[in-house]
Amino acid sequence: MGKSLIQQRRGKGTTTFRAPSHRYRGAVRYVPLNLTKEKTLVGKVVEILHDPGRTAPVARVKFENGMEKLIIAPEGILVGEEIAIGPNAPIKIGNTLPLAMIPEGSYVYDIEGTPGDGGKYVRAGGVYALVVSREKDKVIVQLPSGELKQFNPMCRATIGVVAGGGRLEKPIVKAGKAYYIAKARNRFWPKPRGVKMNAVNHPHGGKEHHIGRPSTVSRRAPPGRKVGHIAARRTGRRK
């Protein structure tokens, strides 16, 4: 009898494949929309923290109404600095406003997909989006991928660039460092290829380290066989 594939083990949901969210700092969401719809909420940065579950640092902010929230830290923010959230907040790094109030050409991040959802887009370390144009019923923003996306003018965004942009500049150099990067998020690492396994472990294993049969497989194949090009219309180079 063959062994379970990696995706079969992952689907079982054991702790080997489960995210260690108990080690994460917590959810990063904007304050509820009803608190800042008409007035500006001001808060002070209490501390800047490393979050194992993110590529960007997070800042803990204490607001004037006593509420504490985690925000994604922008480049250049300092402990003790004040930030503001609301439609009348000044145009300043770290402040959060509706896209309708942000000038064209501004760098923004942590953009809401729909008004009040707390922030969905552009949250990774070192990234930013560009406000390209504003119209009455939509705001066009260029995402880090280069895609031009339309947003509701009432969707909120934070001005600035996400901190942690230099994390990819230093080379990993050795496997030990890659191991700890994966371990922080409980990633399954290293992940061996099927052709390097024994035949008992994988349909592509055994023989002379090549698949030895077509790599295409039916959409209705059983879980232990469903590897390779699943229900592929075509394979190989386009000629």
Swiss-Prot record:
Q: Which SUPFAM superfamilies match?
A: Nucleic acid-binding proteins, Translation proteins SH3-like domain
Q: Name one GO biological process term.
A: cytoplasmic translation
Q: Where is the composition biased (Basic residues)?
A: 222-239
Q: Cite the GO molecular-function annotations of the record.
A: rRNA binding; structural constituent of ribosome
Question: GO CC annotation: what is one?
Answer: cytosolic large ribosomal subunit
Region forming the signal peptide: none
* One Pfam assignment: Ribosomal_L2
- InterPro entries (UniProt xref): NA-bd_OB-fold (IPR012340), Rib_uL2_dom2 (IPR014722), Ribosomal_uL2 (IPR002171), Ribosomal_uL2_arc_euk (IPR023672), Ribosomal_uL2_C (IPR022669), Ribosomal_uL2_dom3 (IPR014726), Ribosomal_uL2_RNA-bd_dom (IPR022666), Translation_prot_SH3-like_sf (IPR008991)
Annotated region (Disordered) at 200-239
Q: Write the record's keywords in alphabetical order, separated by commas.
A: Ribonucleoprotein, Ribosomal protein, RNA-binding, rRNA-binding
Q: Which NCBIfam families match?
A: PRK09612.1
Subunit structure, briefly?
Part of the 50S ribosomal subunit. Forms a bridge to the 30S subunit in the 70S ribosome.
Protein family (similarity comment): Belongs to the universal ribosomal protein uL2 family.
State the function annotated in the UniProt record: One of the primary rRNA binding proteins. Required for association of the 30S and 50S subunits to form the 70S ribosome, for tRNA binding and peptide bond formation. It has been suggested to have peptidyltransferase activity; this is somewhat controversial. Makes several contacts with the 16S rRNA in the 70S ribosome.
Could you tell me what this protein is called?
Large ribosomal subunit protein uL2
Taxonomic lineage: Archaea, Methanobacteriati, Methanobacteriota, Thermococci, Thermococcales
